[in-house]
Regions:
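Short beta-strand/turn micro-motifs at beta-sheet edges
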Residues: 1-2, 28
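Long, contiguous binding/interaction regions
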Residues: 2-4, 48
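Glycine-rich phosphate/pyrophosphate-binding loop shared by adenosine-nucleotide-utilizing enzymes
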Residues: 6-8
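Short amphipathic alpha-helix segments
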Residues: 10-27
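Exposed alpha-helical structural elements
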Residues: 20-24, 49, 85-89
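Short, intrinsically disordered low-complexity segments
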Residues: 27-78
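Charged phosphate-binding loop/patch that engages nucleotide di/tri-phosphates or the phosphate backbone
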Residues: 79-93
Length: 93
């Protein structure tokens, strides 16, 4: 779901933080960490393609979640106590 003037979609991605993510974890887009195992990602990939590309980099039994978000200030998630710079990243600052 996008309304940011581009072909990218904003996603919320979470994986079990106890899973060993690779040192060079490719998030396939512009991304910002929110917390251990949680990222906001803007990607031109479809949800299915992004989900599988992220899943294949993690151990087989890792719990994961990928959800599209409406990429407009009115649709951004509300949050507190997340990684520094997350709101600035959303705003493009």
């Amino acid at each position: 779901m996008h309304d940011n003037g581009s072909d990218s979609t904003l996603y919320l991605f979470w994986h079990d933080p106890d899973a060993a993510a690779p040192a060079e974890f490719d998030l396939h887009g512009d991304a910002h960490p929110m917390d251990d195992g949680m990222w906001l990602i803007r990607s031109e990939l479809t949800r299915s393609k992004l989900y599988h590309r992220l899943k294949w980099q993690l151990p087989d039994d890792t719990s994961i979640m990928l959800a599209p978000l409406f990429d407009d200030p009115a649709g951004w998630p509300k949050f507190k106590g997340m990684a520094e710079g997350a709101l600035a990243w959303l705003r493009g600052s």
